[in-house]
Amino acid sequence: MKNTGYVLTGVANFEKRELPIPEVLEDDVLIQIEYMGICGSDIHAFNGDFGDVTAAAEEQGIMIGHECAGTVVKTGKNVTKIKEGDRVAVEAGIGCGKCDMCKQGLYNLCRDMRFLGCPPDYKGAMQRYMSYPSAWVFKLPDDVSSLEGALIEPLSVGLHATNISGIGLGDSAVIFGAGCIGLTVLLSCLAKGVSDVVVVDVFESRLQTAKKLGASAVLNSSECDVIKKVIHILGEEPKYIFEAAGNPVAAEMCMKLIGRAGVITLVGALLKPSSIIFEDISEKEVTIKTVFRYRNIYPTAINAIAEGIIDLKTMVNKVFDFEEAQHAFEEAAAQKQEIVKAVLKF
């Protein structure tokens, strides 16, 4: 049993390293990773868009990656619910269990959160073997593949976003952004019985994937007046809008488009300043909600896939071998217009 991993040592540079097999504590399981999804935040880290992450990479080397699934090969002495040979999905965020947020069940807002592949630990999933607390891994049934298991993490974001929004059966929605998170919001809306979902993006390949997954209509914002087009399609201003692109222009458009008493849910991470004009919504009694990761959702996500309610495989259009990690990240960063969702296969 040998462990190898890829360590980020600077902007756009991975270094392959031989690593020790992680220690398995009494409440941990040792997982042989089989698939890892390449998240948009991973690409930002790779590109040097996060100053603190780049500084840590250059100083000590860091390991990113948080969307993963694999097979348990060893268990700690206190572990009873997971056994060797079980395939599992890994919930990336671990709350402290002690702060006020954790005590309310809002552990995604924990004041001392440990998130896989993120500061302060930077111990991510880009390695063949990973030790992890057993309380935060979930057994996959036979009809959920390990590939799908790795995508439980982003699906959980979409499910959490729709839960927070309050959208439900018979409603209609607009989603800005058809990347992985936008598509999981789409899938979550459809699973809740939302009647009409319009998806907006600038990349045709992503829009076509949204159409395959069940979007009522797709709009290329570079080719049309989105506001007029949406109102024409839905027959009215939308009550629910999800901003899943992390794009300031899209966020501003949400304010202009939303209907009276509507709900705007901000799912994407806005990394750049946005000139939101609140005058656009001041007379509409609009509710703006924000989403940070997810909580208490993994079992629901796994069941939705197992029962055929949600299809995750369609969004994956690029699979790279783990040994191609450097190339995989370079291509995922450069080919955003073509790559909808990329994964590493170990």
Predicted segment positions?
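C-terminal hydrophobic helical "lid"/dimerization subdomain
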Residues: 3, 248, 252-256, 295, ...
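Residues at the starts of beta-strands that form the adenosine-phosphate
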Residues: 4, 172, 195-196, 263, ...
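Glycine-rich beta-strand-centered segment in the early N-terminal region that forms part
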Residues: 22-36, 51-100, 141-143
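NAD(P)H dinucleotide-binding glycine-rich loop of Rossmann-like/cofactor-binding domains
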Residues: 55, 66, 96-176
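Mid-domain Rossmann-like dinucleotide-binding core that forms the NAD(H)/NADP(H) cofactor-binding site
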Residues: 144-223, 228
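Glycine-rich cofactor phosphate-binding loops and adjacent beta1-alpha1 units
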Residues: 165, 208, 213-287
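Residues in the short beta-alpha loop(s) of Rossmann-like NAD(P)-binding domains
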Residues: 203, 270, 294
